[in-house]
């Protein structure tokens, strides 16, 4: 895991992503000297992996917004810029996008990234542009749209349809780092 933290002065500003469900442990992680090169810490509240979800981490926090807020508040105390990545909900019957976005902003997140699918869809299915747009309309902080970006055209469509401030490319970059 330590090898994943490698960075050098030519990279400019870099962020580290963490996940968990214990506010104090996550704050300690933010304050750990190994994260010193990273002025930004992103908290992953969107991971759909069953093991992570069963531990009450990742996308499970969508079902426990009070704990998610506590995590953000605690991590902000570290002095790092705290951002949050999350999904639009657990499933179609439990969409939480706008409310969760507001709660993360109120807890002190400086930016949010919204993956436009529910946890149960993992990486398949249509990206719900309207849900990402609802997050953008609900908060004053920057909103990054995520999900289904495999080309410049996909990124343009995601920006145009959601009004987001930016786009995050994920899996596609593994196959085409120049995307």
What do the PLM-derived regions correspond to, one by one?
Residues 1-179:
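Flavin-dependent oxidoreductase catalytic cores
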């Amino acid at each position: 895991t330590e090898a994943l933290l490698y960075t050098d002065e030519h990279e400019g500003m870099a962020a580290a992503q963490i996940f968990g469900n214990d506010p104090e442990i996550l704050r300690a992680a933010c304050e750990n000297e190994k994260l010193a090169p990273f002025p930004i810490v992103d908290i992953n509240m969107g991971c759909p992996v069953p093991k992570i979800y069963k531990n009450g981490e990742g996308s499970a926090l969508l079902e426990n917004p009070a704990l998610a807020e506590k995590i953000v508040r605690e991590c902000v105390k570290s002095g790092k810029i705290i951002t949050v990545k999350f999904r639009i909900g657990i499933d179609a019957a439990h969409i939480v996008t706008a409310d969760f976005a507001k709660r993360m902003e109120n807890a002190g997140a400086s930016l949010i990234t919204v993956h436009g699918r529910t946890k149960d869809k993992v990486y398949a299915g249509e990206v719900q542009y309207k849900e990402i747009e609802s997050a953008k309309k609900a908060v004053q902080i920057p909103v990054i749209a995520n999900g289904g970006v495999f080309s410049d055209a996909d990124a343009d469509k995601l920006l145009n349809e959601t009004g987001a401030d930016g786009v995050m490319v994920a899996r596609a970059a593994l196959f085409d780092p120049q995307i």
